């Protein structure tokens, strides 16, 4: 059954005059509060992404171990092979490459003989053996903690360091900066933070400062590299 809308009742028109409405003043306008504009972020890209694998894996393998001086972090500071550089150094990054170390995770001399390297975490460099098969063989041999650990090698020009200052052009040398897993975390942090800065318009820096800091974890002390704009 359809419902019909009731019609409004008709009232007898009254002779009284309608009330006069008194206009009220418009409320005062409250000024709008605008927030300061934040710097716009463009397309984000990790800093130094274009430097990954500039030096090809086959070239890295052909160079072999120890071809260039190796910069590492020690409790006393940065080391270049056996030479002390001090707490800081300035470098120009040419390339950075992933390197996986397949290790028994044991400190005895015999275990050190079984350490292998892979650049893709699939095959052992120099032999072509499967990384997973090699780890399984190490565990079968009694090294229960055998595993693959990710490292990074940075190939760079060393242009200055704390103990000597700025190097003359003829003194600048190419070095292999070896990042431990702890230093690698700091490198990734730098890539993220600097990538944001560059997406906001900051110029890409040519040089980077490497600083060695002393760290402690689970009673173990070690040196760690940190990265900043030179």
Predicted regions and their residues:
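Short Gly/Pro-enriched loop/turn and capping motifs at secondary-structure junctions
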Residues: 184, 215-217
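OB-fold ssDNA-binding interfaces and closely related basic DNA-contact patches used
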Residues: 2-167, 217-229
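Short acidic, glycine/tyrosine-flanked loop/strand segments centered on an H-E-D-like triad
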Residues: 154-194
